[in-house]
């Protein structure tokens, strides 16, 4: 079930691939930044909670965060909160990528935290939306 369509010209002469774009929404100087997967998910989560989010195109693209983490460190960010989908507890591929991202954040000197919510909500956007409906 794909939410995004990626356009590429890699099959064309001098074309280019999509790469692994990183999406950012919020204040780049917040003390805490949340890392999730999917730009739309980050935008929805930000709309609900007004926190700062960085979103990967997919969990395996965590290396694309290196320049982002470097800049966030220069901006004074102190905390990185892992907010990957809840399948991080059931999918070994997601769990491995999650741990690699957290190790990278730790190597940059961030205090790293893991966010957990009710597993019946896959993503942070779903969980925040459910909380909004209850209030």
Question: What are the functions of these language-model segments?
Answer:
Residues 51-52, 99-114:
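Structural alpha-beta junctions
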Residues 122, 126-135:
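Short, small/acidic-rich helices and loops at N termini and domain boundaries
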Residues 113-122:
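Acidic carboxylate-rich catalytic motifs and surrounding loops in phosphoryl-/glycosyl-chemistry enzymes
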Residues 35, 78-92, 116:
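Acidic beta-strand-to-loop metal/phosphate-binding motif
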Residues 40, 60-63, 84-98:
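Acidic, metal-coordinating catalytic cores used for nucleic-acid/nucleotide bond scission
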Residues 1-76:
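Phosphate-handling DNA/RNA-contact segment within nucleic-acid enzymes
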Residues 41, 45, 89, 129-130:
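General alpha-helical segment detector with a strong preference for membrane-spanning helices
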């Amino acid at each position: 079930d794909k939410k995004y369509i990626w356009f590429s010209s890699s099959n064309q002469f001098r074309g280019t691939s999509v790469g692994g774009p990183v999406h950012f929404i919020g204040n780049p100087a917040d003390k805490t930044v949340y890392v999730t997967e999917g730009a739309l998910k980050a935008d929805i989560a930000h709309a609900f909670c007004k926190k700062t989010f960085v979103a990967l195109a997919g969990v395996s693209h965590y290396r694309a965060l290196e320049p982002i983490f470097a800049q966030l460190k220069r901006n004074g960010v102190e905390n990185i909160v892992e907010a990957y989908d809840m399948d991080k507890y059931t999918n070994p591929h997601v769990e491995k990528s999650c741990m690699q991202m957290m190790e990278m954040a730790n190597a940059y000197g961030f205090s790293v935290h893991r966010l957990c919510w009710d597993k019946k909500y896959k993503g942070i956007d779903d969980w925040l939306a459910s909380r909004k409906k209850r209030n």
